[in-house]
Amino acid sequence: MLKQIIITGITNMSENFICISGYDKEGEKYIRPVLSQGQLTEQFLFAYNDNIQLGSILELDFIPPISASSPPHIEDTLFNQFSGRVLDKLNKKQFQEFIASIADRCVEDIFGYEIELFKGQPVLPQGAGNRSLGTIICRKCTIVIDHLGKARCDFID
């Protein structure tokens, strides 16, 4: 099933793995494209007709059912990794306006109220929560880089 998503997030994971998120305007929901075997790597960003970046409008062939994963990762959706094509890119102003149009009010609107602390970090237990992807326009945001070069973002919604 061909769907167009606007890329809203690209996250570096361990090694050269990445996680991407997109927003399906037609279905009005977030989608996290995932592979049936393995994880996406940085090469995915350069695999199609144009580089994938924030604001890219990407067409992928998703494998039904769309978003059949269990909470909180309800956005995880399998796709055919050889099907992609970048259709267009939002410019900076268009992307900012788009993000503002889909923003949630607060963390609880995205994740629900089941957030727990594990080793000092907020987590959602498997099977709990509304969803795992969302957008917040913060009142205050601080980015801290630790001694290992790892970045952490603290914010007030």
Give the positions of each predicted feature.
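OB-fold/S1-family single-stranded nucleic acid-binding modules
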Residues: S56, D61-D157
